[in-house]
Amino acid sequence: MTRISRSAYAEIYGPTVVGGVGDRVRLADTLLLAEVEKDHTIFGEEVKFGGGKVIRDGMGQSQRLATDCVDTVITNALIIDAVTGIVKADIGIKDGLISGIGKAGNPDTQPGVTIIIGASTEVVAGEGLIVTAGAIDTHIHFICPQQIEEALATGTTTMIGGGTGPATGSLATTSTSGPWHMAAMLQALDAFPVNVGLFGKGSSSSHGALLEQVRAGAMGLKIHEDWASTPASIDTCLNVAEETDIQVAIHSDTLNESGFVEDTFAAFKGRTIHSFHTEGAGGGHAPDIIRAAGMPNVLPASTNPTMPFTRNTIDEHLDMVMVCHHLDPSIAEDLAFAESRIRRETIAAEDILHDLGAFSIMSSDSQAMGRVGEIVLRTWQTAHKMKLQRGPLQGDSERSDNERIKRYIAKYTINPAVAHGIAHLVGSVEVGKLADLVLWKPAFFGVKVNMVLKSGMAVSASIGDMGASISTPQPVQIRPMWGSHGKALRTSVAFVSQVSLSNPAVSELGLNKRLEAVRGCRGVTKHDMVRNNWLPAISVDPQTYQVYADGQLLRCEALAELPMAQRYFLF
């Protein structure tokens, strides 16, 4: 029998499991180590494409017709996913959906084949690469269209939010106000290779004014203090949501003008709501909106500027608040408003609450106190910081960080999908879901993508000089691919409300994107947040702003240096 060393095997086919012990992969330049939990491939029967390799007619490629074969296979990939786990497998894609996770090849010549390769099958070499589900960003201010290219370049494939461009209202709030703007923005977003969903303006105590936006195609409603986050508007908005099965997102009342945090909680009446930037620097009852992370009906999220807590976090936030919310630094009241939102103690506690699974979702707040291209990056920087400061999580060891890795990847994949009723199509690497997949070189994990697939078609990839003789010469840049053009844009989805699908005005928009209704939004609770469902009793000292969870003081230091930072962006 011919033998191969473990290191040589990993170089050729990627990491594996031998004798119950998995190979380990470092994520970028962090302290995080992922250990392979299972390998679906079979030693000696691996498939690989290339000259002299296995995927050839009569060998790893069968003679079967397209109906029996996958359209695309990703070979020997390391999947990192909150639901599927950290596993090595071949991934089959058929009709834009993930059709198999297992062993690819030719069943006429190989044992154990669950994914059939034929003449109609394209191959993406996954050896040595990590595959994740595309990120879902639920806090997008649709200010400029160039955000989308930036988002794709960092692995985001679903963008949910609101706005109409650089209008003053959109610079501050994530809502697309009214049926006319809703139609115009759905048509504009039809030109881009990402899944999209729009929030209508939820800040109204008029039932009809909210319902007409949902009928016009809003997948959810956003309550924002700049438009009014009063108990009356909260109650009315949640009433409409309960009727139409959509999600409500909230940016609550920083100034406590219409009531304190207890009044806002009372207005919820136990109904499900998605709390944006729940720490509070991005907005919300000062100083104690962070208490919402301990409520079973609240789905708590962070926006990325406060994540993780570093020596620069406090300083940059004051200017961000002033610009974003149209404040005047010469007006004392405006300055006091901004300063009330920025608290070292609650920002530090936010890191720990993420690490313990009390905060469930990460998002960007793009161009409105957040960076659209850093949702993935800052999630992993936070995980690194917490390992450095707090050590291994329960279930982890000095050898690997699988539990922490699965907890953190859930924050921008499956949990936002569950929160907004789209988990039946996106959010995890599972059979039956859209093949919205991101391939990463481990050294660049979370920083710069290798390739982004939308429904199995490449829409963005790291490619060299297009005038060169091969695809690798410098400058290697992340560029739009064929899936970004023409009618291939149909590989993406526009998420809307169920009630809007029966509205002729929506069907007459003539969108390339497939319209899909959100579902099950109102039955979701914190318990449904995968690997992030801890419900501590959270309190905030009103004088010192110190945060306690189940009576324990949450405190951590700001970092002076982070991984996934300057060394990756010198060019």
Swiss-Prot record:
Gene3D superfamilies recorded: Metal-dependent hydrolases, Urease, subunit C, domain 1
Pfam families the UniProt entry points to: Amidohydro_1, Urease_alpha
EC numbers for this chain: 3.5.1.5
GO CC, any one term: cytoplasm
Active site (catalytic residues): 325
Molecular function, one GO term: nickel cation binding
Reaction catalysis annotation: urea + 2 H2O + H(+) = hydrogencarbonate + 2 NH4(+)
Associated pathway: Nitrogen metabolism; urea degradation; CO(2) and NH(3) from urea (urease route): step 1/1
Binding site for Ni(2+) 1: 139, 141, 222, 365
UniProt-annotated binding residues for substrate: 224
Organism superkingdom: Bacteria
Disulphide linkage map: none
Family: Belongs to the metallo-dependent hydrolases superfamily. Urease alpha subunit family.
PANTHER family in alphabetical order: UREASE
Self-association and partners: Heterotrimer of UreA (gamma), UreB (beta) and UreC (alpha) subunits. Three heterotrimers associate to form the active enzyme.
Identification of the protein by name: Urease subunit alpha
